[in-house]
């Protein structure tokens, strides 16, 4: 994750701003600079290589002292920065909005995936600039539309029916901020269209998850798509979701946290997010993740969501 101010800076033209991508030499200069505390939140002028990000974001970049940041000296960083600027420059951002826009935290890996989709000649995003910009605006929180299959970050499609598409995420192969844990495996499920879904399509998806992915929990971060994650990573996802939800509320950005379809979501996660929306503390909410919950009734005849160890699938071993 990183703020948009880590990729570009605003330049006032008439009554709105144009956004310009940083070059990596300017960033490198900023990372070596000694800057007064009172200037940490200001864009840094490298003199030689142009404007650089505010020094307060130093930890967002990979250095000898910090291996958890972005590999900003890669070609991919430049591609992501340019893509962000193209999307922002399609909007009219005024002085009252610019600080809020640049402070928004976005998924670096999501944006790299959109670059990969854009460069794939077989992908619809290669052929449609309009759809590409729409996808980026959704990714950076500048659109109220949800991420559907056409505008999704992408990956390897492992399941699809009339209503849903399930993607295996390819973060292990990334250049900008790769996941280093070789055991990482995670999926995302997007809606093909943002419209009511038939019970038949839901049952098809639940059956696929029940028999092929029952080593995983189906959760949501509240943004209109599902995530399929290892049970061992659920607590970590809970911490992140809770922190994001509370920070958004604190900063005045009221978000409509979408609980999605209770028949698909792991019931403990549904209880966790429902409790979070009611205003309970993190400890109270997380206890619900580890409780043995009895399902009131089976959502579909012939399908159970209970995990039986003699029926566990091989996906995820």
Curated annotation (Swiss-Prot):
Subunit field text: Homooctamer. Interacts with VP1; this interaction is weak. Interacts with NSP5; this interaction leads to up-regulation of NSP5 phosphorylation and formation of viral factories. Interacts with host DCP1A, DCP1B, DDX6, EDC4 and EIF2S1/eIF2-alpha; these interactions are probably part of the sequestration of some host SGs and PBs proteins in viral factories.
Q: Where is this region: RNA-binding?
A: 205-241
The name of this protein is Non-structural protein 2
Names of the cofactor(s): Mg(2+)
Q: Which residues hold ATP?
A: 107-109, 188, 221-223, 227
Pfam name, any one: Rota_NS35_C
List GO molecular-function terms, semicolon-separated. ATP binding; metal ion binding; nucleoside diphosphate kinase activity; ribonucleoside triphosphate phosphatase activity; RNA binding
Keyword list (alphabetical) reads: ATP-binding, Host cytoplasm, Hydrolase, Magnesium, Metal-binding, Nucleotide-binding, RNA-binding
Please name the catalytic residues of this protein.
225
Which GO cellular component terms, listed alphabetically, does the Swiss-Prot or TrEMBL entry include? host cell cytoplasm
Per the UniProt entry, the disulfide pairs are none
Which cell locations does it reside in? Host cytoplasm
Q: What does this protein do?
A: Participates in replication and packaging of the viral genome. Plays a crucial role, together with NSP5, in the formation of virus factories (viroplasms), which are large inclusions in the host cytoplasm where replication intermediates are assembled and viral RNA replication takes place. Displays ssRNA binding, NTPase, RNA triphosphatase (RTPase) and ATP-independent helix-unwinding activities. The unwinding activity may prepare and organize plus-strand RNAs for packaging and replication by removing interfering secondary structures.
Enzyme Commission numbers on file: 3.6.4.-
């Amino acid at each position: 994750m990183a703020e948009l101010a880590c990729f570009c800076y605003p330049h006032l033209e008439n009554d709105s701003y144009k956004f310009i991508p940083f070059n990596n030499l300017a960033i490198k200069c900023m990372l070596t600079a000694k800057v007064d505390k009172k200037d940490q939140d200001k864009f840094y002028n490298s003199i030689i290589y142009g404007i650089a990000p505010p020094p307060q974001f130093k930890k967002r970049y990979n250095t000898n002292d910090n291996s958890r940041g972005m590999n900003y000296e890669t070609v991919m960083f430049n591609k992501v920065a340019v893509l962000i600027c193209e999307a922002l420059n399609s909007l009219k951002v005024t002085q009252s909005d610019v600080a809020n826009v640049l402070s928004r935290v976005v998924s670096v890996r999501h944006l790299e995936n959109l670059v990969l989709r854009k460069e794939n000649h077989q992908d619809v995003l290669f052929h449609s600039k309009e759809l590409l910009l729409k996808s980026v605006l959704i990714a950076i929180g500048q659109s109220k539309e949800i991420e559907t299959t056409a505008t999704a970050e992408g990956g390897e499609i492992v399941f699809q029916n009339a209503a849903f598409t399930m993607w295996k995420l390819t973060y292990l192969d990334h250049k900008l901020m790769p996941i280093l844990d070789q055991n990482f495996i995670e999926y995302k499920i997007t809606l093909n269209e943002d419209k009511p879904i038939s019970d038949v399509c839901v049952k098809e998806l639940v059956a696929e998850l029940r028999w092929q992915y029952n080593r995983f929990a189906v959760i949501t971060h509240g943004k209109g798509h599902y995530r399929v994650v290892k049970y061992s990573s659920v607590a970590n996802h809970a911490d992140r979701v809770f922190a994001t939800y509370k920070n958004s509320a604190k900063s005045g950005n009221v978000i409509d946290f979408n609980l999605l379809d209770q028949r698909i979501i792991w019931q403990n996660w549904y209880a966790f997010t429902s409790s979070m929306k009611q205003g309970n503390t993190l400890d109270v909410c997380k206890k619900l993740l580890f409780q043995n919950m009895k399902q009131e009734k089976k959502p579909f005849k012939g399908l159970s969501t209970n995990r039986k160890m003699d029926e566990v699938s091989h996906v995820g071993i």
